[in-house]
């Protein structure tokens, strides 16, 4: 009678750190080899009896970039916020504008469109009572930084 064993074919995907693509193929190969050895060691240390790696390769994957969203709050204080998630927008609001003492911020916060956010942002005078240059409005609306775009003037 033969020995029964569980056999797993595993494809492990490890996204490259920033700068990996700029490295030479030999450096990339050495990094993959070390990563493979580390994975084998970890599996062997945790009860796996035998590990074989059939090979390694680098594959360019299409990764979906998260979509920036825009949120508006009117009560208790106005704010226009851009963030990837409503949770992050709420965090920015409570860090920058005011606390969520009554726990109703989630209900008060509504998602708005990018064009609406750009128009609102462009129409609001700054602390110097001047409108922001259009180019700066577009930059702030379209960059990847999560931020509070507008805040209630009574808080300035």
From Swiss-Prot:
Domain of life: Bacteria
Protein name according to UniProt: SPbeta prophage-derived uncharacterized protein YosH
Gene: yosH
